[in-house]
């Protein structure tokens, strides 16, 4: 058995977990979520093999300075997916999602519904691209910040879009507009991208707002990737280095 630490550092939240690898299988021993602005760096183990994904440049710099032995989830470090066509700026979270996907199937799509909504498309273990959309929180903030009177609304989880009706209250009208833009935009891209893959290619949905997509009556079956999909990609990275 081999123990390791994994950090999934997002824009708003960071998941830190201790894992145990045994016969290529991972068991999560402990998992905690923190605000990214309050990561307990002084409490991170320095004597345990560590892997991480970070989408925050300032935090990435801290990790490199304080934990130079930790392995970042970069395209160069992940060998299970061909990233030869990807730009050097490809986010670590997207790379980790691809690594998690190919543990389940050589190809498919991962939709990560977080602060931003990302789609990753993998065909025969090769990353072929994807898309990035603003999440509901970003859209809500933009409408509030760039107008003089619109309030800042909390959109929460999006129900089935087919249930929406006309709204008279400004906040409710904004809410259904924002939810529709984020969800319908994502599903439209999915319908385009899935055509690039063989029939029955899996589509996994992960991220804190994934239920908003899982609630939809989608023509493409959506699989719940759970709370630790990105962490599974980090576990795959750890397994490769700890062989």
Predicted regions, residues:
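Glycine/small-residue-rich loop that forms an oxyanion/phosphate-binding "nest" at active or ligand-binding sites
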Residues: 67-101
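Short glycine-rich phosphate-binding loop at a beta-alpha junction
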Residues: 46-56, 71-72, 199-208
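Conserved phosphate-binding/catalytic loops in two-lobed NTP-binding clefts
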Residues: 68-80, 217-233
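Gly/Thr-rich phosphate-binding beta-strand-loop-beta motif of the actin/hexokinase/Hsp70
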Residues: 1-27, 107-126, 143
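N-terminal phosphate-binding loop and adjacent alpha-helix
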Residues: 23-62, 176
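Adenine-nucleotide phosphate-binding core of ATP-dependent small-molecule kinases
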Residues: 30-32, 161-202, 209, 222-223
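Glycine-rich phosphate-binding loop plus the immediately following alpha-helix
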Residues: 92-97, 102-105, 128-176, 237
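Glycine-rich phosphate-binding/hydrolytic loop that grips phosphoryl groups
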Residues: 95, 179, 223-243
């Amino acid at each position: 058995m081999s123990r390791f630490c994994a950090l999934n550092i997002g824009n708003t939240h960071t998941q830190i977990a201790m894992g145990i690898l045994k016969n290529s299988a991972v068991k999560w021993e402990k998992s905690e979520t923190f605000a990214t602005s309050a990561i307990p760096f002084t409490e991170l183990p320095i004597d345990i093999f560590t892997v991480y994904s970070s989408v925050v440049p300032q935090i990435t710099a801290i990790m490199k300075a304080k934990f130079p032995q930790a392995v970042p989830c970069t395209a160069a470090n992940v060998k299970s997916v061909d990233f030869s066509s990807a730009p050097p700026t490809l986010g670590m979270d997207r790379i980790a999602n691809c690594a998690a996907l190919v543990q389940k199937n050589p190809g498919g799509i991962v939709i990560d519904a977080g602060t931003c909504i990302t789609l990753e498309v993998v065909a025969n273990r090769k990353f072929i691209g994807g898309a990035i959309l603003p999440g509901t929180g970003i859209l809500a903030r933009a409408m509030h910040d760039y107008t003089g009177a619109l309030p800042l609304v909390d959109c929460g989880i999006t129900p089935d879009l087919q249930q929406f009706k006309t709204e008279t209250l400004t906040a409710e009208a904004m809410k259904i507009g924002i939810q529709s833009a984020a969800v319908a935009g994502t599903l439209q891209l999915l319908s385009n991208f899935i055509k690039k893959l063989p029939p029955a290619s899996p589509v996994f949905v992960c991220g804190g707002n994934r239920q908003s997509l899982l609630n939809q009556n989608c023509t493409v079956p959506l699989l719940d990737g759970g709370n630790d999909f990105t962490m599974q990609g980090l576990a795959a990275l750890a397994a490769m280095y700890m062989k």
